[in-house]
Structure formats: C-alpha cells, structure tokens
C-alpha cells in the first residue's frame, strides 16, 4: 500500500463531469484506489463516493492505492488531480 498527499489544482474543483473523468482514470488500475480528505475515505472508483467529498481547488487530499499496480495508480490519479 502506498499513499501520496497532494493539493487539488483543477481550477473548477471536482464537478460531476470532472469526477466522471477521474473515475475513468482510477478504474484503469487493478489496485484498490481511495481518496482521503479530513476524516473521510472513499473509493476513487465510486461516483457517489467521490461526489460526496465535494472537492474544491486548493483542498489537500491523500491518494491511497493497494495492489499490483499501486505505484502507477497513485501516480496516474495524482497527475489528473494536479492538472
């Protein structure tokens, strides 16, 4: 299991269309991928879970992945959120 702390840099934050793209990226990986913010941890492949976070630009999150391609998963998801 690996994790990376980062700041969301997407100008619009994670609106529904951005979340849909995010889930497509997270779903490319076999590893379990989670997003943690404050005391909440959600499955990064769940549209309802991700929408419940209401993430905005400038928020700090932790990306966690566990599985055979965990390094690639964290890197891919973090790259998207840091765009």
Model-found features: residue ranges?
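Aromatic-residue detector
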Residues: 2, 22, 29, 78-80
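C-terminal structural segments of small proteins and small subunits
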Residues: 51-83
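Compact, glycine-rich, soluble single-domain proteins
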Residues: 7-43, 48-53
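Intrinsic-disorder/low-complexity, polar/charged segments enriched in Ser/Thr/Lys/Arg/Asp/Glu/Gln
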Residues: 1-5, 60-62
């Amino acid at each position: 299991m690996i994790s990376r702390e980062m700041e969301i840099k997407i100008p619009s934050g994670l609106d529904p269309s951005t979340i849909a793209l995010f889930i497509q990226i997270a779903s490319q990986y076999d590893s379990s991928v989670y997003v943690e913010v404050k005391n909440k941890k959600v499955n990064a492949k769940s549209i309802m879970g991700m929408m419940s976070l209401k993430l905005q630009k400038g928020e700090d999150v932790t990306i966690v992945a566990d599985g055979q391609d965990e390094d690639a998963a964290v890197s891919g998801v973090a790259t998207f959120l840091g765009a």
